Swiss-Prot record:
Molecular function (Gene Ontology), one example: metal ion binding
An annotated GO cellular component: primosome complex
Highest taxon listed in the record's lineage: Archaea
Lineage: Archaea, Methanobacteriati, Methanobacteriota, Stenosarchaea group, Methanomicrobia
Gene name per UniProt: priS
Record's function text: Catalytic subunit of DNA primase, an RNA polymerase that catalyzes the synthesis of short RNA molecules used as primers for DNA polymerase during DNA replication. The small subunit contains the primase catalytic core and has DNA synthesis activity on its own. Binding to the large subunit stabilizes and modulates the activity, increasing the rate of DNA synthesis while decreasing the length of the DNA fragments, and conferring RNA synthesis capability. The DNA polymerase activity may enable DNA primase to also catalyze primer extension after primer synthesis. May also play a role in DNA repair.
Active site (record annotation): D103, D105, D284
Protein's name in the database: DNA primase small subunit PriS
Length: 380
């Protein structure tokens, strides 16, 4: 990033943290602010410059003063609570528990245009909320949801009841929402169809319907290609596939001994696993299991996009549009040099840019410069 671009971004972030932009400032205060470790990344020409961390604050005012004077590119605080959060060594901090966090990021879910990625991740968020509140006993009021300012959402559970959970307990939770480790035997065993059992049966039913709809030769080739399934077994299965579909709905336990159904539902069988994945909430497992994680501070700016990390209630999610509601900079024109042709929606308008010099609204200019897609060419 060129020096002029760095200075442009520093100036705009300075204006935000110092209240020169309507609705600006990072006023949100996490639970027990004084027990959190804080970390910061800054706009710098030194590509090797790392995070400045092991910092603690005694009050919201002290944090606000730091943001105003230091103007960080990224602001993080620990999901963990510590007796001595500012200690330079992790062993000296004295861990006292941690919030449970789910990270939904497009980088792990889908690639494509920015607005498409954001819409897709939002679908995962709704699935996660449904599982947490409908199946795992958490109330909507327990959830602290933030747009990450980048390509996804963070869901916090800042509850005393989960604060002391270790990594294994947190892994069990994230494995549930992501559908990891589902057992064919337990999914087919007699019991009420709900939660993952219902989703599993739906995925298997869809896969059986897909196979039944294939040309006979293609279906036979697919089934005989499954581990342990001969062409003879596959042919016999195809003759009775409608009966298998009926059993899945009425007496699924009778399919426990069916070699072909078991092979179809094998964890290595990609078509069926794609059906499971589409019904899962694709949370990033390492984030949830990490009991000493740093997470983005709501109200701060994301140095990779220039957008705000926005707290959102469950009831606001449907209407929330990150490319409008998380954008803090306005429509003042700036001139940028784009690295390539692109099309980008922001603030309710779609902008088509060509490689080279373009005059764009400041909101888009900040975004492109933060993303490394463009450099400032004038217009501060």
């Amino acid at each position: 990033m060129k020096p002029a671009t760095l200075e442009f971004l520093r100036q705009r972030f300075f204006a935000y943290y110092n209240g020169a932009i309507p609705g600006a400032g990072a006023g949100y205060s996490p639970e027990s602010l004084t027990e959190r470790e804080w970390g910061f990344l800054f706009f710098t020409e030194n590509q090797r410059s790392g995070m400045r961390r092991h910092i603690s604050f005694t009050s919201q005012d002290e944090l606000t003063s730091y943001l105003k004077s230091m103007v960080p590119a990224h602001v993080y605080y620990s999901t963990a609570y510590y007796t001595h959060p500012g200690a330079a060594q992790m062993a000296d901090k004295e861990w006292r528990g941690a919030d449970v966090i789910f990270d939904l990021d497009a980088d792990h879910i889908v690639r494509g245009p920015y607005d498409i990625m954001l819409a897709r991740v939002k679908e995962e968020l709704f699935k996660l909320i449904d599982m947490l509140t409908g199946e795992l006993g958490f109330a909507k009021r327990d959830l602290r949801i933030n747009f990450s300012g980048g390509r996804g959402y963070h869901v916090h559970l800042p509850l005393l009841s989960v604060r002391g959970w270790d990594t294994a307990e947190r892994r069990e939770l994230v494995n549930y929402v992501s559908g990891t480790g589902l057992s064919f035997d337990s999914m087919m065993a007699p019991s009420q169809k709900s939660g993952w059992k219902l989703r599993y049966h739906d995925a298997l039913n869809d896969e059986l319907a897909r196979i039944a709809g294939l040309p006979c030769e293609d279906a036979l080739s697919y089934l005989s290609g499954l581990s342990g399934i001969s062409e003879t077994f596959a042919a016999g299965f195809l003759k009775n596939i409608s009966q298998t579909q009926n059993l899945l709905k009425s007496n699924p336990e009778k399919l426990l001994a069916n070699k072909v159904v078991r092979a179809i539902a094998n964890a290595e069988n990609e078509p069926f696993q794609a059906g499971i994945l589409s019904r899962a909430a694709q949370a990033d497992e390492p984030v949830t299991t990490d009991v000493k994680r740093l997470i983005r501070h709501p109200g701060s700016l994301h140095g990779g996009s220039g957008m705000r990390v926005v707290p959102i209630s469950v009831d606001q999610l449907d209407a929330f549009d990150p490319l409008i509601d998380a954008v803090v900079f306005g429509e003042r024109n700036v001139s940028v040099d784009c690295a390539f042709n692109l099309s980008m929606p922001i603030l309710g308008n779609n902008y088509t840019l060509t490689a080279g010099r373009n005059v764009v609204p400041e909101a888009l200019g900040v975004f492109l410069c933060c993303r490394g897609i463009a450099e400032l060419s004038g217009g501060i």
